[in-house]
């Protein structure tokens, strides 16, 4: 055979092999695509593997076709199932083949009300101890989903909202299966007892008739948590519901209310250290009360609408936060989340919420992380102040006419903070401020008396990222924005604001955007600007933009780059 013919024959063979390879690949892909997706791998069980797989999910078991989801991976297995079965099961393997399927059909159905690393609770039931690393299976609501079942985490579920099946064996939670992927319509707010999460005693009353776990109570009747929950196990909940239009109050044992009442239901929950009080309320009603708690009624109407969208976006973003999952709550009523003063609703804020019902901010199809604060010094900040990576929609930008882009040097920051600025926030009393610190106001337990401060590092927005406090007996370096503000607050004697007002002994300096003006004889003077962390939407800035005629979408688009606005129920969860 000539060399040319040999080369031709070799080319044909290579082409034929390529075609065969592509064909085989297409066959495998077509088979795998029914259960596999980008986030789940496809495997076959190794022939050397024998033993038991606990709490796996059987996707399919017909004749010799067995498909198993286990620890996030999809396996195609050989075997002869006794009958068709889909769901959670223990699987016996012998040399890589399925030899027995032990179905686990025993389930508790209901709403997930609480969870921790050791237990899970379904509404109406006591908490059950849970398997370590409890598997959670999320079943798609559509039968045409590319991934019909995927393995998730329990934090993918929403306390007080997610409808689940808890798989139980030998009085222990083995797995959770969720069939619902809708966005939450209710929020559970833990009502704190000052800085504590629990109450030693707890009384509830109402000016109207109400029900306690379905049992009618007359108006002005006092419900005592201790009497209801005495002898009950930890985690036991009692739901108190008002009659239509009624409010529920926390009160003393004689029925004298503490503050204003709450819409929605109050849930009394027994814990080891006392009782937890939770307000379960529809999402939009919660936003109605957050809005006037977070923004003055006198602010422009478009700013109020922007704040409503911010508050709603933030709340939905917190629904899967597991901080209070053990108590059966999504968040609390403190400023650590959002101020929630369930006092009085107002027509203007109610209307702002109604006009933006369900609207949230999204970025690339996902819910955006929404942050807001009182006053910008004229330069927005990103997550650098929290030592975290920033998403593309949160940028550090100069919002004054002075377009200096980098304020990380002391010289550039001094020029910025002392210049007359033209900014949206300039009418805020916190736009510029002077803080006077006195070493006489505090004594560090370890290092003694405060001597001086040193700024080690600034962000490009001018915010202090690293501050060293020099004491008589040593030094302490702080590198978190909030900790810097409150550490200095211990020594804060006077705070003089831009509108001429003075605040004596405030709890913290308004922001970490400051310079050290002077320090001598135990007195340190700071010059700064802004109030809050500086990330996201400035409320005073939003007010000014609204008064200029800008719509809420423009306001939010100014502070959050390239975001879109979507009804939360249209989101792909």
Predicted features, each with a name:
Residues 2-573:
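Conserved, single-site charged/polar hotspot
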């Amino acid at each position: 055979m000539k060399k040319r013919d040999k080369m031709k024959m070799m080319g044909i063979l290579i082409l034929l092999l390529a075609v065969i390879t592509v064909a085989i690949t297409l066959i495998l892909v077509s088979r795998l695509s029914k259960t596999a997706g980008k986030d789940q791998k496809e495997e076959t069980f190794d022939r050397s593997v024998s033993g038991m797989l606990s709490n796996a999910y059987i996707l399919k078991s017909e004749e010799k076709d067995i498909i198993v989801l286990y620890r996030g991976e999809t396996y195609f297995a050989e075997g002869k199932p006794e009958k068709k079965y889909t769901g959670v099961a223990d699987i016996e393997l012998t040399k890589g083949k399925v030899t027995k399927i032990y179905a686990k059909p025993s389930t508790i159905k209901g709403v997930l009300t609480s969870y921790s690393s050791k237990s899970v609770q379904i509404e109406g039931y006591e908490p059950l101890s849970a398997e370590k690393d409890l598997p959670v299976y999320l079943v798609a609501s559509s039968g045409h989903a590319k991934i019909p079942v995927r393995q998730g985490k329990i934090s993918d579920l929403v306390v007080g909202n997610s409808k689940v099946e808890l798989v139980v064996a030998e009085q222990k939670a083995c797995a959770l299966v969720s069939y619902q992927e809708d966005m939450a319509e209710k929020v559970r707010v833990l009502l704190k007892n000052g800085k504590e999460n629990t109450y030693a005693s707890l009384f509830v009353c109402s000016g109207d008739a109400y029900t306690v776990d379905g049992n009618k109570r007359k108006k002005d009747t006092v419900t005592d948590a201790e009497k209801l929950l005495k002898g009950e196990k930890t985690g036991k909940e009692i739901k108190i519901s008002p009659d239509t239009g009624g409010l529920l109050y926390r009160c003393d044992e004689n029925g004298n209310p503490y503050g204003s009442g709450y819409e929605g239901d109050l849930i009394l929950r027994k814990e080891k250290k006392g009782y937890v009080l939770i307000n379960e309320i529809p999402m939009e009603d919660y936003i109605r009360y957050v809005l006037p708690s977070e923004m003055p009624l006198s602010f422009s109407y478009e700013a109020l609408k922007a704040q409503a969208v911010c508050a709603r976006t933030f709340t939905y973003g917190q629904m899967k936060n597991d901080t209070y999952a053990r108590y059966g709550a999504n968040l609390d009523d403190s400023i650590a989340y959002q101020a929630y003063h369930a006092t009085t609703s107002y027509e203007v804020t109610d209307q702002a919420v109604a006009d933006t019902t369900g609207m949230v901010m999204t970025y690339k199809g996902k819910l955006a992380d929404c942050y807001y604060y009182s006053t910008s010094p004229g330069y927005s900040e990103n997550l650098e102040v929290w030592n975290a990576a920033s998403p593309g929609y949160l940028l550090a930008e100069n919002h004054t006419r002075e377009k200096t882009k980098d304020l990380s040097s002391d010289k550039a920051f001094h020029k910025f903070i002392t210049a007359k600025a033209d900014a949206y926030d300039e009418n805020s009393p916190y736009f510029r401020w002077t803080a006077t610190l006195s070493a006489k106001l505090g004594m560090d337990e370890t290092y003694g008396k405060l001597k001086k401060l040193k700024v080690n590092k600034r962000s490009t927005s001018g915010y202090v990222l690293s501050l060293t406090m020099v004491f008589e007996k040593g030094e302490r370096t702080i590198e978190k924005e909030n900790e810097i503000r409150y550490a200095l607050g211990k020594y804060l004697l006077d705070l003089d604001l831009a509108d001429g007002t003075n605040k004596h002994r405030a709890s913290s300096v308004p922001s970490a955007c400051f310079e050290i003006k002077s320090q001598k004889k135990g007195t340190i003077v700071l010059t700064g600007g802004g109030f809050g962390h500086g990330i996201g939407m400035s409320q005073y800035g939003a007010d000014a933009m609204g008064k200029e005629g800008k719509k809420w979408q423009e306001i939010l688009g100014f502070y959050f780059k390239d975001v879109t606005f979507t009804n939360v129920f249209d989101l792909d969860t």
